[in-house]
Amino acid sequence: MCKLMLFSLLFASALLAQDPGEKIRVIAFGAHPDDCDIRAGGTAALFARMGHHVKFVAVTNGDAGHQSEGGGALAKRRRAEAIESGRRLGVTYEVLDNHDGELLPTMTVREQIIRRIRQWNADVVLAPRPNDYHPDHRYTGVLVQDAAYMVVVPNICPDTPPLRKNPVFLYFEDDFQRPNPFRPDVAVDIDSVFMNKIRALDAHVSQVYEWLPWVDGLLDQVPKDPAERLNWLASRPEQPMGTALRQSLEKWYGPAKGAQVKHTEAFEVCEYGRQPGNDDIRKLFPMLGK
């Protein structure tokens, strides 16, 4: 192994060797104000419960995501919903003012993302994979990928100090198979905070009780009573847990506990950014089993 490669590996390992008392800083990017909550709300609640710092960023303002509302009024409503969801989870929530349905991987938006990662001094960055049915989701994945190296380059966005360590970038779980299926490198047991996640999603009234049921033809099934709505949301069918996801749970929590988990959130390590080993992942995701 050449000296330069050895030095790089030792340097990366040293940067990940965090003091047990040091707080982990996580930033998650979703295309719309509810995407982070859907894909990582439970994991965020666990981080927050342990005293770590989490920020959700919606890259668009959601001003197109409704069947009967739109524009500035809808964007204002969705921003308020996001802030309330963040309050319920114990995380910071920011909504960027880019139009819903019009997101492109431009330099302007890339710089917005680079600055947020730097300002948060992130250890972990979460985002969608760049293959998805929605162009905003795809381009959010591309934009975060494009920021993965640039966050340490001083001459890019020089108004914001560069990071001295590259974060670990991970993808949210999805069900898309092409060009390649999602790989659950990290699987988090969220059973203990499942209702925290549901209550956070409940804050996104315009989405979980109006827009998404309308899209799915289920609007007439949504209860009117707030308590019944919460129960309806919690009882919505989830995707069956596949073999790879169950194996990942058993890897991180042991066979006995891993076999019992009902609700989970999973993440795939991005090939860009820092490449963590198993010990590094346990440091960065301290809720995993020992």
Annotate each predicted stretch with a short phrase:
Residues S8-A17:
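Hydrophobic h-region of N-terminal signal peptides that target proteins for export
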Residues H66-E69, N180-P184:
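Short acidic, glycine/proline-rich loop/turn micro-motifs
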Residues Q18-W120, V142, M150:
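Active-site rim/loop-helix segments in enzyme catalytic domains that contact anionic ligands
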Residues G42, N131, D175, G273:
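Flexible, active-site-proximal loop/turn residues at the rims of small-molecule/cofactor binding pockets
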Residues K55, T92-D174, F182:
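Internal alpha/beta domain cores that form substrate/cofactor-binding pockets in large enzymes
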Residues N61-G62, D174-F176:
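Short "lid" loop at the C-terminus of a central beta-strand within the Rossmann-like core
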Residues M1-S8:
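Sec-dependent signal peptide recognition
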